[in-house]
A protein has these predicted regions:
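Conserved catalytic cores of phosphodiester-cleaving nucleases, focusing on short active-site segments
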Residues: 33-48
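Beta-rich catalytic cores
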Residues: 29
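Catalytic cores of nucleic-acid endonucleases
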Residues: 7, 20, 44-91
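General helical secondary-structure elements
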Residues: 39-41, 54, 114
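Short glycine/proline-enriched coil/turn segments at helix->beta-strand junctions
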Residues: 17-18, 35-38, 69-71
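Non-catalytic C-terminal interaction segments of nucleic acid-processing enzymes
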Residues: 11, 21, 25, 78-133
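Acidic-basic catalytic patches of nuclease active cores, encompassing PD-(D/E)XK
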Residues: 1-25
Length: 133
């Protein structure tokens, strides 16, 4: 987990005082933290957008992992000074339209790699956030 995500995790844990989120100890895990009720993927965006992007591979893996472990999959996205919380498990249950599409995107977001690949991505309107911190 990058330092930006750790700071977001610390902020989130102010809301999870009785059941704090624990950072994943596996570097290549598809989610960043979990507790007994949730698995959480954390993203930090430099700008605020009306929609946020979720990659299908993380979406599908984390939904399945959450289901197998009787947890909810939550996507936490920081834009500007706000953290938008999306309960992906519930959005999926309510047949949310993620508007999936193939898109050319950088292969790795954390590295200065300019190589693009096609990724299947979906979109979530920020107004559909479960909570905003």
């Amino acid at each position: 987990m990058k330092s930006k995500e750790r700071i977001i995790l610390q902020r989130l844990n102010r809301a999870f005082l009785t059941n704090p989120l624990i950072e994943s100890n596996y570097e290549y895990n598809r989610f960043d933290a979990e507790n007994k009720n949730y698995i959480v993927e954390i993203k930090s965006r430099n700008n605020k957008y009306d929609q946020t992007i979720i990659e299908f591979d993380k979406f599908s893996y984390n939904l399945l992992y959450a289901k197998e472990n009787n947890k909810f999959f939550v996507y936490a996205v920081k834009m500007n000074d706000k953290i938008y919380i999306f309960n992906i498990t519930k959005l999926k249950e309510f047949n949310y339209n993620f508007n999936w599409e193939w898109r050319e995107m950088p292969k790795y977001t954390e590295f200065n790699n300019t190589k693009n690949i096609r990724k299947l991505v979906g979109y979530i309107n920020i107004e559909d956030a479960t909570k905003v911190y």
